[in-house]
Curated annotation (Swiss-Prot):
Keywords: Amidation, Neuropeptide, Secreted. This is Tachykinin-related peptide 3. Signal peptide: none annotated. GO terms for cellular component: extracellular region.
Length: 10
């Protein structure tokens, strides 16, 4: 799951 929006998944 994303930690902070979209780029949180990278």
């Amino acid at each position: 799951a994303p930690s902070s929006g979209f780029f949180g998944t990278r």
